[in-house]
Design a protein with these regions (language model features):
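His/Asp/Glu-enriched, well-ordered alpha-helical/loop segment
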Residues: 367-377, 384-407, 411, 417-421, ...
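Hydrophobic h-region of N-terminal signal peptides that target proteins for export
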Residues: 22-31
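Divalent metal-binding segments
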Residues: 33-39, 48-299, 306, 311-315, ...
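Ligand-binding beta-strand-loop-alpha-helix segment within the catalytic cores
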Residues: 429
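Short, charged, surface-exposed secondary-structure boundary motifs
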Residues: 289-292, 440-444, 581-582
Length: 582
């Protein structure tokens, strides 16, 4: 027979013990006193009410309290608590850039700074300087830029690059490259060379290659991209770039597309305790490879969505559907038109851009990834690519609901009301980078006309339809946070979302502006949701990771054009002050 439990009034001794144990457990986890308190500030929590508090307390890398100065200091302050008077400054949740390319950015200026390359003359000067220091016969690579950002507003051809007779030259425009005459010669590319599948060798009016290769870089001989950097240099460059992101106010970033080698670099940085901030990796595969190879690799990969921890984990699986709008390979719903042919060096009046695989192949690859538990994503810049991605998602949705995977379109630069409605029905999010609008809007307006850009990065239309937006930069080249390709300063991105101002000072479709609060959510709680992390980051609430950024002016009330000038004065990551400029 079990012994009866002694009672004191209505409370059992066992119950009292359980309560005591629970209290002790909380004390062990949180401790009696906070490690850090920020007070006398404007703490923008980005909670469900978008409340603004005066103070926040941190213990063991977690937020433990928010509220008034008096309440937080009285309940959380102890003899060992560091107390910081914000003197009225604003604190935001740690900012999240959902899509950038840290390794590429880190390597771009690892050995020497890059000059501005905004004209043919600047490109030619760069080639001449490199020719003086590069052994004859070795490739000279002109760092990435786009014809939409050149004063000439025209893709260079081989003649523009023919300023050195002794070196093959490559002009890097991402999915399109241009090579000089010597580069064509040593690669054996002639008027009779067939274009590769899903690629094209562009030709002049005489039928000779003009140097422009669209998704045809595989034809080049002797080019060794990245081979000049050792693994240690790559690790150092990656670490350096991630640290620059942290200093800009970012506490989490989304790697925009890493292959197997690049994934190992992240894992090594983490193992060596050199990871400066939180990283969510998008695993990218080259959809141009044979289908059997792709599905075999997907099924045997040792990771899937959400594997990892708060510092390094896997996000989505990614393939590229099309190329870029800045180089004329984004797959559009309509042909590019006369100015597009001039800008991009096109000759076919019916050219709509490029798809990198067949619809059947995309479906098969995504089906294999979904079976492994991946969230699905795709680089889609043109409207035609957006539509094909949604058709693929609808086919998968008929097999099993796709919404729980939190799949998303990356860029989705050219939208339509119909496509946005389909995204809402499927639960597809939009991974957007406002920098493209700012940097390339004026050139693209010449290609498509003002009305043709009505749904170009349509943030307001997304929100009105109930589509989740995650904000980012698509940074890829350069160290300067405000002048890089693309600028990774998060406040630059927020400013564009709020104003829709281009680099010419024009406003592109003001009806698509969002509020400051909405813009901030794209870099905080909505970006966290896209990463399956809204329960641990993206807002300043008790129990969440203590990631915050203190800024030098009031984001919510400063003049609009001051948003882009905001500077972080303190960054807190995992409860520790890691950047301090106050």
């Amino acid at each position: 027979m079990l012994a009866q439990t002694p009672r004191t009034g209505c409370v059992t001794i066992a119950g009292m013990l359980r309560t005591l144990i629970a209290v002790l457990a909380v004390e062990l986890i949180w401790g009696a006193d906070a490690d850090l308190i920020l007070y006398n500030g404007k703490i923008v929590t980005v909670d469900a009410q978008f409340s603004i508090q005066q103070a926040v307390a941190v213990k063991n890398a977690r937020i433990v309290a928010t509220g008034s100065n008096e309440a937080v200091l009285k309940s959380q302050r102890g003899p060992h608590t560091r107390v910081v008077d914000l003197r009225g400054r604003m604190a935001l949740p740690g900012l999240i850039d959902s899509h950038l390319h840290p390794l590429e950015g880190g390597l771009s200026e690892f050995r020497e700074p890059l000059p501005p390359l905004d004209s043919y003359a600047a490109i030619q000067d760069y080639i001449r300087r490199q020719a003086r220091r590069t052994p004859k016969g070795e490739w000279i690579v002109v760092p990435r830029t786009f014809p939409t950002r050149l004063k000439e507003l025209r893709m260079p051809t081989r003649e523009v690059l023919d300023v050195t007779p002794d070196h093959p030259v490559l002009f890097d425009a991402s999915y399109v490259v241009v090579v000089n005459t010597l580069g064509l010669k040593i690669s054996g590319i002639t008027r009779d060379t067939p274009s590769p599948p899903h690629g094209e060798i562009l030709k002049d009016e005489r039928g000779e290659p003009n140097g422009i290769l669209r998704n045809a870089q595989s034809l080049l001989k002797g080019l060794r991209p990245g081979a000049a950097f050792s693994e240690q240099e790559k690790l150092s460059a990656l670490e350096k770039m991630l640290r620059m992101y942290l200093e800009a106010g970012l506490t989490s970033v989304g790697e925009g597309g890493a292959n197997l080698e690049e994934i190992r670099l992240y894992e090594k940085l983490k193992a060596e305790k050199r990871l400066p901030l939180r990283v969510v990796i998008t695993w990218w595969v080259n959809v141009g490879r044979p289908l059997d190879d792709l599905t075999r690799e997907i099924r045997s990969a040792p990771w899937t969505t959400n594997e990892g921890d708060d510092w390094l984990k896997f996000g989505a699986f990614k393939v590229n559907f099309d190329g870029g709008m800045t180089i004329g390979t984004a797959y559009q719903r309509q042909p590019y038109g006369p100015f597009g042919r001039q800008l991009y060096g096109k000759t076919d009046p019916n050219d709509r851009g490029q798809l990198f695989a067949t619809p059947e192949k995309y479906l098969a690859v995504f089906r294999a990834a979904r079976e492994r538990g991946w969230s699905l994503s795709a680089h889609t810049q043109g409207g035609g690519a957006v539509d094909l991605f949604l058709e693929t998602m609808e086919a998968l949705d008929r097999e099993r609901p796709i919404a729980p995977t939190r799949s998303h379109l990356i860029h989705a630069s050219f939208q339509s009301p119909q496509a946005i409605a389909r995204m809402k029905r499927l639960g597809i999010a939009a991974d957007v980078q406002a920098a493209w609008l700012h940097c390339d809007g004026p050139a693209l307006e010449k290609v498509f006309g003002y009305d043709g850009l009505r749904y170009f990065f349509p943030l307001r239309s997304y929100l009105d339809a109930g589509v989740v937006i995650a904000g980012g930069s698509d940074h890829m080249i350069g160290y300067d946070k405000n002048r890089a390709i693309n600028p990774y300063n998060p406040f630059h991105g927020l400013w564009i979302s709020v104003t829709r101002k281009t680099n010419r000072g024009t406003v592109l479709h003001p009806e698509e502006k969002v509020t400051r609060e909405e813009a901030l959510k794209t870099y905080t709680i909505w970006a966290a949701w896209r990463q399956f992390a809204e329960k641990i980051k993206g807002s300043i609430e008790p129990g969440k990771l203590a990631d915050m950024v203190v800024i030098d002016r009031d984001y919510l009330s400063c003049p609009e054009d001051d948003i882009m000038r905001i500077e972080p004065v303190m960054v807190i990551l995992d409860g520790k002050i890691v950047v301090e400029k106050m």
